[in-house]
Amino acid sequence: MAEETPVFQIQRVYLKDLSLEQPNSPAILLEQEQPSVDIQLGVEATPVVEGIFEVAVTATVQTKIKDKTVFLVEAKQAGIFEIRNVPEDQMGAIIGIACPQIIYPYLRGNVADTVTRAGFPPVHLAEINFQAMYEQQQAAAAEAATSTAQ
């Protein structure tokens, strides 16, 4: 009976990858114009062994003045999660919503800290509704499957 008890535990949260580029420094630092900011987020999950998953949230933050990059930060925050005895129809939501919600605050802090340490005002990543993001991805996948089947 104990084997059937659902298990959801965080084993570890860690910074998997981080890069910062300032390709146009120092000249770009003399510009007075406000840069544009583009932020891209992604979530990926990989099974490690039976019942253990790595879930990673990736952020790419690029700031530009005109067509020149001020800085580019790419960060991947990951977590190892033990997920066992959970119904198959709930696994997607746990991996696509619950796990990223746990990891994301660490990613936000690492991005803000990296940008600040590089000498720029911090970039604060907004709160993310991972449930809405997951539902959009599921709807897009269902739509793609429907259009492929026709």
UniProtKB/Swiss-Prot annotation:
Main localization (coarse): cytoplasm
GO CC term, one of those recorded: cytoplasm
Intracellular or extracellular location(s): Cytoplasm
Alphabetical GO biological process terms: protein folding; protein tetramerization; protein transport
UniProt keyword terms in alphabetical order: Chaperone, Cytoplasm, Protein transport, Translocation, Transport
Superkingdom of the source species: Bacteria
Keyword Lipoprotein: no
Keyword Kinase attributed: no
InterPro entries: SecB, SecB-like_sf
SUPFAM superfamilies: SecB-like
A Pfam family this chain is assigned to: SecB
MF (Gene Ontology): unfolded protein binding
Assembly description: Homotetramer, a dimer of dimers. One homotetramer interacts with 1 SecA dimer.
Purpose of the protein: One of the proteins required for the normal export of preproteins out of the cell cytoplasm. It is a molecular chaperone that binds to a subset of precursor proteins, maintaining them in a translocation-competent state. It also specifically binds to its receptor SecA.
NCBIfam families documented for this protein: PRK05751.1-5, secB
Family to which the UniProt record says this protein belongs: Belongs to the SecB family.
Protein's UniProt name: Protein-export protein SecB
Organism of provenance: Acidovorax ebreus (strain TPSY) (Diaphorobacter sp. (strain TPSY))
